[in-house]
């Protein structure tokens, strides 16, 4: 037996506040099959509150809370040790380092010092 057939046999979903609901007139009980039929035909579902939600077209309200810092934004220092270490490894080589590593310097025996 599937869950919707079980719901049909029990007569629908009971409200969580069953004791309080008994004081008020009970809304029309609809089985799941009847509910499906009503929705497919585009008809009103009995006991369902209809909300009228419309756009406001007004200006959005400004946030009252301060902006939270991003995880990589450290309020204490401008650069963390991790970013300093990364910066030193990614620096371009100096002129001396370039001349030692160049193919012309290797063929010629390196830079000459006078």
From Swiss-Prot:
UniProt-annotated location(s): Peroxisome
Sites of Phosphoserine modification: 102
Domain of life: Eukaryota
Subcellular location, principal: other
Region (Disordered): 1-26, 53-114
Any Pfam family hit: KPWE_dom
This protein's record includes keyword Phosphoprotein: yes
GO cellular component, as recorded: peroxisome
Record key words, sorted: Peroxisome, Phosphoprotein
Purpose: May be a peroxin involved in the PTS2-mediated protein import pathway.
Protein name, UniProt field: Peroxisomal biogenesis factor 39
Gene name of the encoded protein: Pex39
